[in-house]
């Protein structure tokens, strides 16, 4: 009897990725949900009287909605790090993962978790409570009995399979650093086994999202009240400012002497943001 096919899930704070692999050979294939890229945004949009939307579609719908529409919408993102201590975050995670299965059915993507061995990556420094909660969330969402795997193992295997690092070097001892959207995970691996891990389940890229939000408000102090009145504070804080952070990063990668500018919806602009200004704010954050 051939080995059972695998469905692997990288359930991230900002983006979530799905990968299918036959049971008899190592040939993983990422799942494209229609955006010409693997994965989708970890987001869910609850709509009064309508089916919830997930992924990039949820963010786009909220971004394009009128103020009247937004009064009937609830957008949730970045809930993964809070699933242990927050019932709301746990419920959002369940509904998001349910929504992925429904989206896959509608697009005939055949995730078929009940017919596959399902594994979900978790930060190596995560404790047993977090891992247990992840498996419970997945089971409640319809994925069956799920096994968790330390994310650094998947990261290292990916780099070895793509030729980024020789397998012989990978076995000697490797430090894997995963600075994700919600967590910061360090793992020292020897012969493919995590020997030591450390980091923080609360530190990650979302701290920079918040820093850029504060930077924007320093330059546009009148914007906050208008955001709150329009019900936009969450969307601007965690979505638009994340986009601004990512664009700033690309700009600085190209040329750190360049001054960065970015409009944030109808609420104003970040102007003349510099690398030195970023470093100064990051040190003081």
Summary of predicted features, one role per range:
Residues 32-35, 147-153, 202:
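Active-site nucleophile and cofactor-binding loops and adjacent substrate-binding regions
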Residues 134, 141-164, 168-173:
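Hydrophobic, small-residue-rich alpha-helical packing segments that form membrane-like cores
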Residues 218, 250-285:
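Helical "lid/coupling" subdomains associated with nucleotide-phosphate turnover
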Residues 23-141, 211-212, 217-262:
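Phosphate-binding loop and its immediate beta->loop->alpha context
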Residues 2-29, 163-195:
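Gly/Thr-rich phosphate-binding beta-strand-loop-beta motif of the actin/hexokinase/Hsp70
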Residues 11-15, 151-155, 182-183, 204-210:
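Conserved A3 ("GATE") glycine/threonine-rich loop of ANL adenylate-forming enzymes
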Residues 194-202, 223-227:
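Short beta-alpha connecting loops at secondary-structure transitions
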Residues 93-111, 152-167, 281-285:
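Phosphate/ATP-binding catalytic cores across multiple sugar-kinase/actin-like superfamilies
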């Amino acid at each position: 009897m051939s080995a059972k096919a695998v469905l692997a899930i990288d359930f991230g704070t900002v983006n979530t990725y799905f990968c299918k692999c036959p049971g008899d050979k190592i040939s993983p294939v990422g799942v494209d949900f229609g955006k010409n890229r693997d994965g989708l945004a970890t987001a869910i949009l609850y709509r009064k009287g309508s089916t919830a939307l997930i992924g990039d579609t949820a963010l786009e719908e909220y971004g394009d909605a009128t103020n009247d529409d937004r009064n009937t919408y609830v957008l949730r993102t970045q809930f993964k790090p809070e699933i242990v201590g927050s019932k709301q975050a746990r419920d959002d995670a369940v509904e998001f993962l349910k929504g992925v299965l429904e989206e896959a059915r509608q697009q005939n993507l055949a995730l078929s978790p009940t017919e596959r061995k399902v594994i979900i990556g978790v930060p190596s420094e995560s404790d047993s409570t977090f891992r247990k909660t992840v498996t419970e969330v997945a089971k409640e969402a319809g994925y069956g009995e799920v096994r968790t795997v330390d994310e650094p193992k998947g990261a290292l295997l990916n780099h070895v399979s793509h030729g980024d690092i020789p397998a012989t070097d990978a076995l000697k001892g490797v430090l894997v650093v995963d600075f994700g959207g919600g967590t910061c995970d360090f793992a020292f691996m020897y012969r493919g086994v995590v020997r030591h891990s450390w980091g923080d389940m609360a530190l990650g890229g979302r701290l920079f999202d918040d820093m850029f939000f504060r930077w924007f408000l320093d330059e546009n102090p009148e914007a906050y009240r208008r955001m709150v009145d329009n019900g936009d504070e969450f969307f601007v804080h965690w979505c638009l400012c994340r986009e601004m952070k990512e664009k700033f990063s690309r700009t600085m990668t190209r040329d750190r002497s360049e001054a960065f500018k970015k409009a944030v919806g109808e609420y104003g602009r970040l102007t003349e943001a510099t690398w030195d200004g970023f470093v100064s704010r990051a040190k003081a954050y």
